[in-house]
A protein has these predicted regions:
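Bacterial Sec-dependent N-terminal signal peptides
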Residues: 1-23
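Preference for extracellular/luminal or secreted protein segments
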Residues: 21-66, 278, 300-580
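Second-shell residues forming the walls of enzyme active-site clefts
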Residues: 38, 59, 75, 83-100, ...
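Short acidic, glycine-rich surface-loop motifs adjacent to enzyme active sites
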Residues: 65-82, 165-166, 241-262, 460-473
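Flexible glycine/proline-enriched surface loops and loop-helix/loop-strand junctions
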Residues: 170-171, 257-258, 378-380, 571-573, ...
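Short, conserved catalytic-motif segment at the N-terminal edge
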Residues: 577-637, 658-663, 667, 825
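Short, surface-exposed loop or secondary-structure junction motifs
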Residues: 677-858
């Protein structure tokens, strides 16, 4: 693994929009603007002020005033919403005499700061995915999201190597705990951002990964020697500089090996000028971390603090607490000669260059003439589906089976009893439960008060730990009752699977698991992670993610347990199988129209391609105005029974006796002795070219007269009768009558004619062969191993509730009632609901499993 990443570092040399690489026209314009600026304007360019689009008009006017009066160079957009941000930026651009450089913390997209925006996976998830191409694609998607809301510089990626599991502020914001991983993914994300006209910012130099404290609240101390810093913390930053990163953010840290005085690194000339500028020859922007943070704000007052930051070598002073005081302090220092105006010109020129190579000038000009919201939205349309694609791919690639697992993976045997227990933040784990049930329906329990008897009575225990991953630096951990429950479950000796939907450092708080166990880290707790996790458990997808961090006895960084797919049906997205979403969207409108005009009250539709369900929806109601259709609800499959119950039996037999298809029905069942049907060749019957009639309305013989009806039917459930519907039973001897009628029916040559009748005969043949009723054989041999629990004959007898079954018909010719819960086909109903040609019920999900089994060739 380490070798592979080292190779990646040597070959990742893509064209970058290098900082300072200008056309002659751009260079002339920058010099021209700089030559006309007053000292006040130049000083103002150093400030990047906080702007909140969720605050009121007074705040907006205050920031506008700073733009007009102090000529601030930019703003860092904080909390708010995308539309409000664009409206605010339009006002600020109009208030500013020069273009503004707009920055935002957008490590996982604008969702880090803005409501109703797309949240991408965290950097730690990206590190686990271990796919440099995906990381670059993520950078590209992040760039488009930035441009959509008027942002020119994204304060990302985090280049800190998170070697301290208890780090209170970095955590999942880092790509991991190895210099190779952080370097490779950092470079790739920088390329994705800057290759799409958004300036990247590597942070938090000289390295915030090995801290016990949060620099927002205090000045953290890093006890690393210079040699250790060079071997660990500095490696990703140096790699980023060598690959053209546009800016570096300086952290507020106390690192005695660099600055024995205890001065914050953000104010240290030794760190910024001597290392970054002189030793590394970094030409890009150098930006302080926010100056309102306790790690630096208590060191000096506004006015003095900004002077110290400039002396250290910073170009942009981020989030100054008091712009008037800061401006006054800097102006005084420049006019007195304490600070060099020539140096100021060099730094302001770098800021102007940054504006020139991003969309700063374009957005400033647009704001004067057009709606910034309308223009930027139209320029960046169609991105949401691509955002979802790259996020889906990353989360799918990241899922990690911890290397110390011993339980069988994937879970193959489904004819066992399963239980699922949810722990942690249980706000919404419905998707995980629903997709577990798509593979194997099971009992679901919530919380640490789960009855242990239920777990003891099961064969397989699945535990899921969920946490809100809104703040990825948090290290979620088990509480005492959850710890106790997992310990007790582990001691039962069952096959146990723990799926961790949270920051993986929380796994360090788990008890040691005994016996057959496997922990899976999903890193995220969103709908995609919950959709994918069951697929990894049950082998629909291969699992190849790596641990991006050290987890003690649970595994080392770079380790994993690679799990192969066993080709079970997957649930995914159209892009995975080369489909466009547009044709699938038309299914919605077609079904809506069908329901609207009364063609059907509802239905289920499932579309799968290459073993991947890319569309699965339920529509409408069971009856007109009735219960909503759910994905679990059963429909009468009618003639699909032929290929879903009877055909598997013939195929199973054929595997043992390949010449079966050339033999006759009479070779395998005595039902046809003496009739011309005993000479029918099996392959001709299968091909519907045996001459059999299409069907026989057997039921008509039983209702010709009232006396005949009285003979055949009773409303009682008594011995010698089989139920057709509640309060309607028919004599079991009708079976002999039906086969007698079939045996006497006429044959009509070898032309193709679709026929039910051969499948009545196949049922007889198979039941004699297997010495077992067809419904029992196909359930035990085919459906149960497939996990197709909702493929069933006689659903009411097999434990399904009536409201899980969609009615078939209003029968006014024989049963004179709503056909609900029993088979619609008259012949199958007369046989008690089990027949070779009809009788099966299923939902679209389990029918899909059966069809995929055929496509997989078994």
């Amino acid at each position: 693994m380490m070798y592979r990443i080292r190779v990646v570092l040597t070959v990742l040399v893509f064209p970058l929009l290098c900082f300072g690489q200008l056309t002659d026209k751009q260079s002339f314009e920058v010099d021209s603007v700089l030559s006309k600026m007053t000292l006040q304007q130049k000083v103002g360019q150093l400030f990047m002020v906080a702007a909140y689009s969720n605050q009121g008009i007074e705040h907006q006017r205050e920031v506008e005033s700073l733009a007009r009066t102090y000529h601030i160079g930019g703003v860092i957009m904080m909390q708010g919403g995308p539309k409000r941000q664009l409206h605010f930026l339009q006002r600020l651009h109009n208030a500013s005499s020069l273009p503004l450089l707009v920055g935002q913390d957008a490590e996982w997209g604008q969702a880090m700061r803005l409501d109703s925006t797309y949240k991408f996976p965290t950097s730690l998830t990206v590190g686990a995915a271990n796919d440099i191409v995906l990381t670059k694609d993520l950078g590209k998607a992040l760039a488009f999201e930035c441009k959509r809301v008027g942002v020119h510089i994204s304060f990302s990626p985090v280049l800190d190597v998170n070697t301290n599991p208890t780090n209170p502020i970095i955590g999942a914001r880092s790509f991991g705990s190895t210099v190779q991983g952080v370097s490779a993914h950092g470079i790739a994300q920088i390329q994705g951002l800057q290759g799409n006209d958004v300036l990247a910012c590597g942070k938090h130099f000289p390295g915030h990964g090995d801290t016990q404290q949060d620099s927002h609240k205090t000045l953290p101390k890093v006890d690393r020697s210079l040699a250790e810093l060079k071997q660990m913390e500095w490696v990703p930053f140096k790699a980023a500089v060598d690959h053209g990163v546009g800016s570096i953010m300086i952290a507020h840290l106390n690192i005695p090996s660099l600055e024995p005085s205890g001065k914050p690194t953000s104010l240290s000339k030794k760190v910024i000028t001597e290392v970054l500028k002189n030793q590394w020859n970094f030409k890009g922007l150098i930006i302080t971390d926010a100056l309102n943070m306790k790690g630096v704000s208590e060191y000096a007052s506004p006015g003095k603090l900004e002077v110290e930051a400039f002396k250290a070598g910073n170009d942009i002073l981020l989030f100054p607490m008091n712009v008037p005081a800061a401006s006054k302090g800097l102006m005084t220092s420049f006019t007195s000669g304490e600070l060099s105006i020539e140096e100021l010109d060099r730094r302001v020129k770098k800021i102007l260059i940054a504006k020139s190579i991003t969309r700063s000038y374009e957005d400033w000009n647009l704001s004067k003439k057009f709606s910034l919201e309308t223009t930027l939205t139209s320029l960046n349309q169609g991105r949401r589906s691509l955002n979802e694609e790259v996020s889906f791919k990353i989360i799918a690639a990241a899922a990690t089976a911890l290397p110390n697992g011993t339980a069988a993976m994937p879970i193959k045997e489904l004819d066992r009893k399963f239980i699922h227990i949810s722990l942690g933040d249980l706000t919404d784990n419905s998707i995980f439960k629903a997709y577990l049930d798509r593979y194997k329906e099971m009992s679901h329990f919530t919380g640490s008060d789960t009855p242990l008897e239920a777990a003891r009575a099961s064969d397989v225990i699945i535990v899921s730990f969920h946490q809100n991953t809104k703040n990825p630096w948090k290290r979620y951990k088990l509480n005492a009752s959850e710890f106790k429950l997992i310990s007790e479950l582990s001691s039962m000796g069952k096959s146990m699977y723990v799926v961790h939907f949270a920051n993986p450092y929380g796994i360090l708080t788990y008890p040691s698991l005994k016996g057959n166990q496997q922990v899976i880290s999903m890193y995220e707790n969103n709908h995609v992670a919950q959709l994918l996790a069951p697929q990894f458990l049950f082998g629909a997808r291969a699992m190849k993610g790596i641990l991006p961090v050290e987890l003690g006895t649970w595994g080392k960084a770079g380790d994993s347990r690679l799990i192969q797919s066993i080709q079970r049906l997957k649930y995914g997205r159209p892009f995975e199988v080369g489909l466009s979403e547009a044709p699938l969207d038309r299914i919605d409108s077609t079904m809506s129209h069908a329901i609207k005009v009364g063609a059907t009250p509802g239905g289920q539709i499932l579309v799968a391609r290459r073993g991947n369900v890319v569309y699965q929806k339920s529509f409408g109601t069971h009856t007109y105005g009735g219960k909503d259709v759910g994905w679990k609800d059963l429909y009468d499959l009618a003639s699909i029974t032929k290929i879903t119950a009877t055909l598997p039996g013939i195929m199973h037999w054929y595997e043992k006796q390949p010449l079966l298809l050339k033999t006759t029905l009479g070779n395998h069942t005595n039902r046809l002795a003496g009739s011309d049907k005993e000479n029918l060749v099996i392959e001709d019957v299968l091909a519907h070219q045996s001459g059999l009639a299409a069907w026989i309305p057997f039921y008509l013989k039983t209702i010709k007269t009232d006396s005949i009806k009285d003979y055949w039917y009773t409303d009682l459930d008594v011995e010698g009768f089989v139920r057709i519907r509640p309060e309607m039973s028919i004599r079991t001897e009708v079976r002999d009558t039906m086969f007698s009628m079939l045996a006497k029916s006429e044959l009509s040559g070898s032309d193709y004619r679709y026929s039910d009748l051969g499948y009545y005969l196949f049922q007889e043949m198979l039941e004699e062969r297997f010495n077992e009723p067809l419904d029992q054989w196909v359930t035990n041999t085919i459906y149960a191993p497939l996990g197709a629990q909702r493929l069933t004959y006689t659903p009411l007898k097999n434990g399904f509730l009536l409201d899980e079954i969609v009615p078939s018909e209003e029968d006014s010719y024989w049963r004179n009632s709503t056909v609900h819960g029993t088979v619609h086909d008259m012949g199958a109903a007369m046989l008690g609901g089990v027949a070779g040609h009809a009788g099966l019920f299923a939902n679209s999900n389990d029918l899909g499993k059966m069809m995929q089994m055929y496509l997989n060739r078994g």
